[in-house]
Amino acid sequence: MDKRIFGIETEFGISYSSPDSRPLAPEEVARYLFRKVVSWGRSSNVFLTNGSRLYLDVGSHPEYATAECDDLGQLIAHDRAGELILDDLVDEAQERLAAEGFNGTVYLFKNNTDSAGNSYGSHENYLIPRRGEFSRLAEILIPFLVTRQLIAGAGKILKTPHGATFAFSQRADHIWEGVSSATTRSRPIINTRDEPHADAEFYRRLHVIVGDSNMSETTALMKVGTVDLILRMIEAGVIMRDMRMENPIRSIREISHDLSGRALIRLANGRQLTALEIQREYLNKVTSFVAENGAHNQHVPLILDLWERTLTAIESGDTSTIDTEIDWAIKKKLMDSYRKRHGLGLDAPRIAQLDLTYHDISRTRGLYYLLQSRGAVRRVVDDTAVKDAVDAPPQTTRAKLRGDFVRRAQELGRDYTVDWVHLKLNDRAHQTILCKDPFRNVDERVDALLDSMG
């Protein structure tokens, strides 16, 4: 596919610190957080004027699903816009709590685990052609996704019986299957439930749920951009070496816990490779493919360069070449510097707090955003693009139709129903408009509906 639709769904961790007032359960805090949303949307599951979906997921985790994007920079801007939208809700919830005598602080974290060992996810969506065997696609992708944490992990302090250690991935220890139609019970690498949110005759949606939530824009670019490149190769019929793993679930944990990237992974055919060797195989294939076919977007040169530099950094043990671009390396540098300054071990409570605060989405409290304000991390998009994405949908996809409809209906106070493919005014006998093509940003039926609304 020359153009692909992308989306990222992010579940956020929520907590409330209250030294001087009674504690609140996450469920209670979430209700305060969504009170404004429920007041105008009559639900805690709404679509916004930027085409995105905002809702409370299982376990009172606020979740933001970006609108359909057809460009990686656009996707990152809309993913970051979700943080701003939720951060505004935090401020409003804070004011309401204070007015009711609660003097604590609400925190939202873009991470994947909490102190109780619960896990919540970051799910990627890729539109793929219906043709071809999905099982073959999964076989090719799973070895890549299991080892992708080397180039896209968020980093985490892992408590073990032998003490604390630093791991590549937050999500790796919470994945239990290779492929499955469930997302919460079994937590697979790839979710196989067939919900394309598009014309099912032509398209399928690849739903990847193994990845970490990323604070770094360049890491997010790597996470999605590398999968896009591999999908392009598969769609072009490139033959890939068989790297199916004997036990991908055991392997994903072993890889996360081994910062050298050299732990041997047993393949289904009995051979053994390291995570670095597996990643190199994919990188070499993609590099050759791009050399023959050209880069299909402006981000490809950076993706290939950073992919190469990250693997080289792991091989050499010198991460100074990537510690402004890859989440786990940025975080590790921060921790190592703090530990050295204060003479602390990895198991120190202050280091655990640092690990968590890195993921605080507050632009004034969060450690990642403190680094960003100092110019200590590399960016993909600028603040203007992110702020624009808070209100405006992507102009090149179906999200424009949805966002424009939601905006007009809200301005006029009309009762409406929307989802990823349907638009409907409830206070009129209009038929539901079905928008099955996610690439289509112009639709005469939607134009007529908007005009008829006044």
Curated annotation (Swiss-Prot):
Which keywords describe this protein according to UniProt?
A: ATP-binding, Ligase, Magnesium, Metal-binding, Nucleotide-binding, Ubl conjugation pathway
Task: Give the EC number(s) under which this enzyme is classified.
Answer: 6.3.1.19
Q: Which residues form the active site?
A: D57
Q: What class of enzyme is it?
A: ligase
> InterPro entries in the record, alphabetically?
Pup_ligase (IPR022279), Pup_ligase/deamidase (IPR004347)
Task: Cite the Pfam families for this sequence.
Answer: Pup_ligase
Protein residues bound to Mg(2+): E9, Y55, E63
Which reaction(s) does its UniProt entry say it catalyses? ATP + [prokaryotic ubiquitin-like protein]-L-glutamate + [protein]-L-lysine = ADP + phosphate + N(6)-([prokaryotic ubiquitin-like protein]-gamma-L-glutamyl)-[protein]-L-lysine
| UniProt: ATP binding residues | R53, T66, W420
The UniProt record lists the keyword Nucleotide-binding: yes
Q: What's the further remark here?
A: The reaction mechanism probably proceeds via the activation of Pup by phosphorylation of its C-terminal glutamate, which is then subject to nucleophilic attack by the substrate lysine, resulting in an isopeptide bond and the release of phosphate as a good leaving group.
Belongs to which family? Belongs to the Pup ligase/Pup deamidase family. Pup-conjugating enzyme subfamily.
Identification of the protein by name? Pup--protein ligase
Q: In the UniProt record, what gene is named as encoding this protein?
A: pafA
